[in-house]
Every structure is written in C-alpha cells, then in structure tokens.
Amino acid sequence: MSTSKNEYYDMTRGQKTCFVFSNSTYRSKKDEITLRKTFIEAGYKVRVIKDTNLIKTTNILSEFSEFAKKKKVCAVIVFILSHGVVNGEVYVGSDRCNLNYMVNAMDTEILRGVPKMLFVQINKEYRSVYENFKDVIVKFMSNTNLATLPDTTVVSIEDPCPAHAEYKPASPDVPLDFYYRESWYTNQSKDVTRVGSPMIQELCKLLRIDAEFCEIMALLDKKLEKFHIEP
C-alpha cells in the first residue's frame, strides 16, 4: 500500500477524539459506558456530554474545532445516543437537531481533511439495520485513501411502514472527509438499558478483542470480516 502523504491521511499521530452525546432520561447508559471504555482503550480522548441542547451542542463542537489545531487532532468520531426523531430531526439531549448543524460545526478550515464520523443510534424502537458500515469502519480506521471511500449512504428499512419511517433522520449533507451512519430499533421486547444497542455493543466488542495486543487499525481489518447483525 502506498504511503504517499498526498494520498493517505496519517491517523497514527496526533490526538483522536470521541464525543458521546447522551441523556439521563432514556435508555443510553449501557452504550454510553461501553463507548467510553472502548475508545479510551483505543487511544481516543473521550468526552461524554449529557442533557445538552441544540445551542450548547453546536457550541461544543465549534469550540473543539477552534482548538483542534493546537491539539493536533487527527480523527474525530461523534456518537449521538438519541431517543427519537421528529420531522427528520434527531433528539440530541433535550432538543431536536438538524444534523446539518452538527456537520457544519465541524466542517471548519482547521479540521478540513481530518477524518470525521457522525454515528446516530436511535433507541425509540429496537432493530439494528446498517449499510456498508463494515467497509467504512475498516477504511476509516486503517489510513485508507480517502478518495476510495464509498459515497455516504444512510441506513434504510426495507418496505418501511409509516411508523418506522417516522423515526428515520434526514440525511445531512456531508463533505468528502465526513462519514455518516445511523442505526435504530423496532422491537420493544429487548431491554437496551441492560444489554445496550446491538450495533454499538458489537462494534465495541470487536474493537476490544485484541486491543491490548495490537493496533486498532490492524485489529479491525482482521475482525470486521465477520461483522454482521441480524435484524
């Protein structure tokens, strides 16, 4: 694999940052704990933010973008643990948020070219559906040529009924260095408060398996070939 500086982005140097936007009222505690533990072990600076609102959320991301140059940030992952969607807007803490606001807050000159991912987990109902998630994670975490990443795609439910479609976020407009994915549930029989969201729990499990023995980049290339979640 070529290591041309013009072709590949070096994610082995600098600070990697993970934001987790959560809340105290709904069923995100298990996922919140798992994400925090996993990404700290993977060498990320993790910040869990609860019960925020739209203005505070965008301000937090904007302020982070301003300090990113000083911290030499080389990768940013943002998880939103949400309890629902209304008119395409995702609940982030206590407010509904158009995801474009969050993308725009990080699409700054300082962070331009730095790989960024926005992942939305919705626990209104229980079902995990994904598209191209394995490929994106593998490439995102393995210094792959950004130009070869697939076009941004969003998860969709096959033949969704109106009740399911109601919970689908409006896809944000994202630049080439920004990747967006979402997952949600449609089965209330699972207690996600106790067991967590399958997508997040499985992803973090794969990240942790050999984390103390090898680099995350190499780990994911090997493990994610078997990554699959039944709806």
From Swiss-Prot:
Q: Which SUPFAM superfamilies match?
A: Caspase-like
Residues making up the signal peptide according to the UniProt record? none
Q: Which domain of life is it from?
A: Viruses
PROSITE patterns found in the cross-reference section: CASPASE_P20
Q: Any one Gene Ontology biological process term?
A: proteolysis
What would you give as a GO molecular function for this chain, any one? cysteine-type endopeptidase activity
Pfam families referenced in this protein's UniProt entry, alphabetically: Peptidase_C14
Q: Which family does it belong to?
A: Belongs to the peptidase C14A family.
User: Can you say what this protein is called?
Assistant: Caspase-like protein
